[in-house]
């Protein structure tokens, strides 16, 4: 394991878990055309994967984070070097296979963005268990654990439930941002779940075409004990916050996006930083909304600027409370959508 920088004992520590990290490569081309050889611009390399992105933004915002992740091969070595250069503390579980790459191609002529995501390496059972062992030790002294991103090929879909069980035994709040089977197999133990509408739709098995349906689905997860709090990111339309007793709508922050990468991770990071400061959920989600907007100003997967986050935070309107009578839930039962 590697940890190039010590954490500040005076600050609440945030542990992030990234089971499928990536070396993010961003480049540009005039026009994307099939079959032709396209001459691209100089590449930009960034350390990536959900939890790693969260740790980078926590660091930018002045929080104290340690990124925990498996890594291997030359891509894993470069990813670690980039994190070290950024001053983000990390702990690595060495694996035999090589860390994956992901590619973002910006088409200059149209301002369109193309994102290509590789599946990632398979982890042995021993490597998977070592990740949990490292988390178990780290969670005991953490203020929050953030598990974010996809699971690698071959890892059981209930892996994040095992993460939740570890956090529950450590009395450490878990913030989860994932999709697919990793999300669908969560049954309990999550403090805050961040989901897009698509991810929420997959989780409950309904189309969720309207805001009342989206809020009702979020409350369904809370009522079933799968999470205590649900934040639904709505992209350009803002966000929703659901707790056991209330719901709030957060408006989007007007701005012109440069990139569509990383806004969700920035939102999760800023929410966690806010909570680690002792802020209310509402204030923390306002900060998350601001960080998500600030992330859209950066090229590729570069971290957002703290000044932009603070500026957008000041611009962000207070949320609107949504009455319970506006989101009565009539679920469409999908036996494959929930455990």
Swiss-Prot record:
Amino-acid positions noted as binding substrate in the UniProt annotation, renumbered to this chain: 22-24, 37-39, 49-53, 100-102, 150, 265
Biotechnology: Has strong T-cell and IFN-gamma inducing capacity in human tuberculin skin test positive patients, indicating this might be a good vaccine candidate.
Organism: Mycobacterium tuberculosis (strain ATCC 25618 / H37Rv)
Role summary: Catalyzes the phosphorylation of D-fructose 6-phosphate to fructose 1,6-bisphosphate by ATP, the first committing step of glycolysis. Can also catalyze the phosphorylation of tagatose-6-phosphate. The catalytic efficiency with tagatose-6-phosphate is about 1.8 times lower than that with fructose 6-phosphate. Can use phosphate donors other than ATP (GTP and ITP), with lower efficiency. In addition, can catalyze the reverse gluconeogenic reaction, albeit with low efficiency. May support and maintain basic glycolysis and metabolic fluxes during conditions inhibiting PfkA.
The keyword Lyase is annotated on this UniProt entry: no
Cofactor, how bound (note): The magnesium does not function as an allosteric effector but is essential for glycolytic reaction.
The protein, known as: ATP-dependent 6-phosphofructokinase isozyme 2
Keywords in alphabetical order: Acetylation, ATP-binding, Glycolysis, Isopeptide bond, Kinase, Magnesium, Metal-binding, Nucleotide-binding, Potassium, Transferase, Ubl conjugation
Cofactors named for this entry: Mg(2+)
Gene3D superfamilies documented for this protein: 3.40.1190.20
GO molecular function: 6-phosphofructokinase activity; ATP binding; metal ion binding; tagatose-6-phosphate kinase activity
N-acetylthreonine PTM positions: 2
Residues involved in K(+) binding: 259, 261, 295, 298, 300, 302
